C-alpha cells in the first residue's frame, strides 16, 4: 500500500532514533512518504535522515525534541501545522525497572509526560485534524507489558495499558471514516533497550523479533484491525497468559524479573 496516496504526504515518527522507530521511518519512506524524525539526539537523527534519503530518495526532516518537556506536543503541532500530515506514529516511551518504591519518583513523572501527556495531546490534535478532512492514520506502538500487571515494571506497564485502551477506543470511533487508528503491540523486540534488560524466560527470548519484522507485519494490518500483536509466537504466548488465573500470571511474570529486585 502506498501510504502517501492513501493518507497524505508526510509521516512523523515520534521516537525515531533506533529500534522500532528507526525501522518505521524507513518503512514509511519506502511506502512513499516524506518523513519527519523526532527524537532527542540530533546527530543520530541527522545520520538516520541521510541514510533514509539515500536509500529511498524521499525528503527527510529532523526535529530534535525531548518529549518529556512540558510543551513538547505544542511545539510539534506548531512545526507541522502547514504540512500535509498523513501518518503519526508514536513509538517513544520511557520506562524504569526495579522495585516500585526504589525508583526515584522524578523518573515516574518524566515517564508520565512522555507516555501519557505528550502522547494524549498529539492523539487528540491529529485525530481531530484527520477526521475533519477524512484522511490520515495514527499508529501507537504498544507492548505486551501493557496487557497485564508487571512486577518490577509496574508504572511502565500501567502507562502502556493506558496507551493501549485509549488507542483501541479511538480506533473504533474512527471505524466508519477514512481515518485509520491502530495499536501495534510488540512483544520481545531486539532493540538496544531490550538487550539491556533481556528477560530470563527462554520463551520470551525465543519469541524476540527484529524491529523491521514487527513494522512490516504491523503495517499490513493498518486499516484492517483496531489492535494487533505482531508475531505468531507472541500471540500464542498471550493466549497462554489469558488462560491463566490472574494471580498466577502476576506471580509468573514477577519471577521472570526477580533479578531486578
UniProtKB/Swiss-Prot annotation:
The record's subunit annotation is: Homodimer.
- Kindly indicate whether the keyword Oxidoreductase belongs to this entry: yes
- State the reactions this protein catalyses: a 7beta-hydroxysteroid + NADP(+) = a 7-oxosteroid + NADPH + H(+); ursocholate + NADP(+) = 3alpha,12alpha-dihydroxy-7-oxo-5beta-cholanate + NADPH + H(+); 7-oxolithocholate + NADPH + H(+) = ursodeoxycholate + NADP(+); 3alpha,7beta-dihydroxy-12-oxo-5beta-cholan-24-oate + NADP(+) = 7,12-dioxo-lithocholate + NADPH + H(+)
Give the UniProt keywords, A-Z.
Answer: Bile acid catabolism, Lipid degradation, Lipid metabolism, NADP, Nucleotide-binding, Oxidoreductase, Steroid metabolism
Q: Which organism is it from?
A: Clostridium sardiniense
Pfam families of this UniProt entry? adh_short
Q: Which residues form the active site?
A: 156
Q: Which gene encodes it?
A: hdhb
Gene Ontology terms for molecular function: 7-beta-hydroxysteroid dehydrogenase (NADP+) activity; nucleotide binding
Q: Where does NADP(+) bind?
A: 17-21, 40-41, 66-67
Report the pH sensitivity of activity: Shows a maximum of activity at pH 8.5 in the oxidation of ursocholate, and between pH 7.0 and 8.0 when tested in the reduction reaction of 3alpha,12alpha-dihydroxy-7-oxo-5beta-cholanate, with a gradual drop on the alkaline side and a sharp drop on the acidic side.
- Positions of the site: Transition state stabilizer? 143
Transmembrane segments in this chain: where? none
Family assignment? Answer: Belongs to the short-chain dehydrogenases/reductases (SDR) family.
Summarize induction of expression. Answer: Induced by bile acids, when grown in the presence of deoxycholate or chenodeoxycholate.
Traced from the root, the source organism's taxonomic lineage reads: Bacteria, Bacillati, Bacillota, Clostridia, Eubacteriales
Ligase as a keyword? no
Q: What is its EC number?
A: 1.1.1.201
Protein name, per record: 7beta-hydroxysteroid dehydrogenase
Q: InterPro entries this protein is in? A: NAD(P)-bd_dom_sf (IPR036291), SDR_fam (IPR002347), VLCFA-Steroid_DH (IPR051019)
State how activity varies with temperature. Optimum temperature is 40 degrees Celsius. No activity is detected above 60 degrees Celsius.
Q: Which SUPFAM superfamilies match?
A: NAD(P)-binding Rossmann-fold domains
Which superkingdom is the protein from? Bacteria
GO terms of biological process kind: bile acid catabolic process; lipid catabolic process
* Top-level enzyme category: oxidoreductase
PANTHER family on file: RH59310P (PTHR43899:SF13)
Amino acid at each position: 500500500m502506498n501510504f502517501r496516496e492513501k493518507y497524505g504526504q508526510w509521516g512523523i515518527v515520534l521516537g525515531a532514533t533506533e529500534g522500532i522507530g528507526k525501522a518505521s521511518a524507513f518503512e514509511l519512506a519506502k511506502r512513499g512518504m516524506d518523513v519527519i524524525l523526532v527524537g532527542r539526539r540530533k546527530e543520530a537523527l541527522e545520520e538516520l535522515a541521510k541514510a533514509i534519503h539515500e536509500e529511498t530518495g524521499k525528503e527527510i526532516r529532523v526535529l530534535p525534541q525531548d518529549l518529556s518537556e512540558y510543551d513538547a506536543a505544542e511545539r510539534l503541532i506548531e512545526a507541522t501545522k502547514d504540512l500535509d500530515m498523513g501518518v503519526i506514529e508514536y513509538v517513544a516511551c520511557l520506562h524504569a525497572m526495579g522495585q516500585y518504591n526504589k525508583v526515584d519518583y522524578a523518573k515516574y513523572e518524566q515517564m508520565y509526560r512522555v507516555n501519557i501527556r505528550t502522547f494524549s495531546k498529539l492523539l487528540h490534535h491529529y485525530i481531530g485534524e484527520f477526521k475533519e478532512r477524512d484522511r490520515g492514520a495514527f499508529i501507537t506502538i504498544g507492548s505486551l507489558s501493557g496487557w497485564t500487571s508487571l512486577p518490577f515494571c509496574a508504572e511502565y506497564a500501567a502507562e502502556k495499558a493506558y496507551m493501549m485502551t485509549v488507542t483501541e477506543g479511538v480506533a473504533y470511533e474512527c471505524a466508519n471514516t477514512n481515518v485509520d487508528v491502530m495499536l501495534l503491540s510488540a512483544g520481545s523486540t531486539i532493540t538496544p533497550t531490550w538487550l539491556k534488560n533481556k528477560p530470563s524466560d527462554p520463551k520470551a527470548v525465543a519469541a524476540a523479533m527484529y524491529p523491521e519484522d514487527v513494522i512490516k507485519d504491523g503495517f499490513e494490518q493498518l486499516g484492517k484491525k483496531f489492535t494487533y500483536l505482531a508475531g505468531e509466537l507472541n500471540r500464542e504466548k498471550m493466549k497462554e497468559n489469558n488462560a491463566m488465573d490472574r494471580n498466577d500470571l502476576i506471580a509468573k511474570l514477577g519471577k521472570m524479573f526477580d533479578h531486578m529486585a
